[in-house]
Structure formats: structure tokens, C-alpha cells
Regions:
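Short, glycine/acidic-enriched capping/hinge loops at junctions between secondary-structure elements
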Residues: 1, 51-52, 109, 217-220, ...
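Flexible, acidic active-site loops/lids enriched in D/E/S/T/G that coordinate Mg2+ and/or position polar
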Residues: 1-44
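Catalytic, metal-anchored helix/loop core of enzyme active sites in primary metabolism
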Residues: 2-5, 57, 122, 245-257
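A short glycine/serine-rich beta->alpha loop
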Residues: 27, 69, 144
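A short, structural micro-pattern
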Residues: 32-34, 55, 200, 225-226
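Glycine-rich phosphate-binding loop plus the immediately following alpha-helix
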Residues: 43-88
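Extended hydrophobic packing segments that form well-structured cores
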Residues: 224-257
Length: 257
């Protein structure tokens, strides 16, 4: 993991901002569950949102290109789901909402169930869920809702910047003490951070490799001769999404060093 402000690389241009999560879904990996990813994103220098000290979590809502103008993070859940359904030319009960399986989401879950939408509870790793919600050729998740990590919001925004869609976020204090500390530091807790606020650059790249097999990517598979990995790479300039199946041979790797 990189700390905020850490410098990496060989010191030569081009200069870029880097966001990385070596394991998005640490609990998933520890328990051998599906969906753990290694994730990295880059953008022009100074264009990625850097969370202020003390900001750990954000409220989030993420959708695909057809619904990008339909969402408002300040609106009630029922209103957002109605707008999303209309934009998708579907019914609310056709929608699938991804939510992290956490006690803090009990009220959101209740509201989603009240209007009849389906729920997919995810154990960890909301970056993959945000990407799946934004992908036009994936219909397993229509919207990501709930509270997750602030660094993961930037990574998700980088991917969404490449493929279209929209993510909106707001800083979420975990308790009153944290809320008062953030206010004292001059942080506006009502501010909405959209995709272009989280990643302002127009030259964005995103890549993820599966660690444990999930719906987005296969996990690492080990063999006597080496390993096979499954990755996705995206670029904002072209909107290109590439899936890469790579074979890594132990003998060749040691010779290359």
C-alpha cells in the first residue's frame, strides 16, 4: 500500500498520480472467498482526489452510462431507484442493488427492500461492484449503494472515468467525535464528490487482476510450471477495455531477473 504523498518510480517524466489497493477484499482473500482483486489506477499529476487526514469512509452511489444523470446521492433511496429504473426503461423490481454486508447498512437495506428492488450483499471489495454497476455489458448489478472506503472511491472513479457511468460520494464520519474533528479542520461534510471531482484528469488508466475468482475476473491459478492470471485494463482517452489472460512461467521469470 502507498501512503498519501509517497513518491514512486524512476524520477523521470511523465509525472502521474497513482492510486493502488494491493488487495481489494482482504477479508475475502483471508477466507478464500471469491472476488479479491489487486487494483491500480493512474492519472495526470495533481488530478486525483487525495482524502484529507481523518477521512476514511464515504457514502457512495455508482451506476452505468445510461443512468449517469439519474442519480442524486442526497435523494432518498426510493427516488434514486425510481429514476434509475426509468433511465434503464425497467421496473424497480428488475434492479439489483449491491450493498456491502455491514450493520451500518441496515436502514439502506430496509429501504431498498421496501420498494421491491433485489439486493446483492457483498462481503468486501466495493471497487469490483462499482465497476460492474457501470459496465454496459454486465447486468448482474445495476447500482452500488452504501458506505465504503475513501481510497476505494477514487479507484472506482478511475475505472468509471474510463468506461462511462457516474459515481457520487460524500464523506462519512464514523462517529460524532470524528464528525466534529473534520468540521474543525474545515471539511465540508455536505460536499458531493462526483466522478470528475475524484479523478479530474482526461488521461486515466485503470487495471485490476483477480486474486480469488469472482464475477469480474478469474483468480490466480497455480500450476507446476507457473501461474495464470486474469486482468482487465481500461483507458479513458479511447474508452477501450481489454481483458488479458496471462501465463507466467517460473523458469522464464527467474531467467529474466
Amino acid at each position: 500500500m502507498l501512503y498519501i504523498g509517497e513518491h514512486v518510480g524512476n524520477g523521470h517524466k511523465p509525472e502521474v498520480d497513482v492510486a493502488v489497493d494491493p488487495v481489494d477484499g482482504t477479508r475475502l482473500l483471508a477466507l478464500g472467498l471469491p472476488g479479491a482483486l489487486a487494483v491500480v489506477a493512474t492519472a495526470e499529476r495533481g488530478t486525483m482526489y487525495s482524502a484529507p487526514p481523518g477521512v476514511f469512509y464515504m457514502e457512495k452511489i455508482a451506476v452505468g452510462p445510461a443512468m449517469r444523470n439519474a442519480i442524486d446521492i442526497n435523494a432518498p433511496v426510493a427516488v434514486n431507484l425510481d429514476r434509475i429504473a426509468r433511465a434503464r426503461e425497467a421496473r424497480i423490481d428488475d434492479l439489483t442493488v449491491a450493498i456491502l454486508d455491514r450493520p451500518r447498512h441496515a436502514e439502506i437495506i430496509r429501504q431498498v427492500r421496501e420498494v421491491g428492488a433485489r439486493i446483492r450483499l457483498i462481503g468486501d471489495g466495493d471497487v469490483a461492484a462499482a465497476i460492474q454497476a457501470a459496465m454496459e455489458d454486465y447486468r448482474g448489478i445495476d447500482v452500488l449503494l452504501g458506505i465504503g472506503g475513501a481510497p476505494e472511491a477514487v479507484l472506482a472513479a478511475a475505472a468509471i472515468k474510463c468506461i462511462g457511468g457516474e459515481i457520487q460520494c460524500k464523506i462519512w464520519p464514523r462517529n460524532d467525535q470524528e464528525r466534529e474533528k473534520l468540521k474543525a479542520d474545515g471539511i465540508d461534510l455536505s460536499q458531493i464528490y462526483r466522478t470528475d471531482d475524484l479523478v479530474k484528469g482526461n488521461d486515466v488508466a485503470f487495471a485490476a487482476t483477480g486474486i480469488t475468482t469472482g464475477e469480474l475476473l478469474d483468480g490466480v491459478q497455480y500450476f507446476g510450471w507457473g501461474a495464470r492470471t486474469s486482468s482487465v485494463m481500461m483507458r479513458s482517452r479511447s474508452g477501450t477495455v481489454r481483458y488479458i489472460q496471462a501465463r507466467h512461467k517460473w523458469r522464464k521469470s527467474s531467467q529474466a531477473q
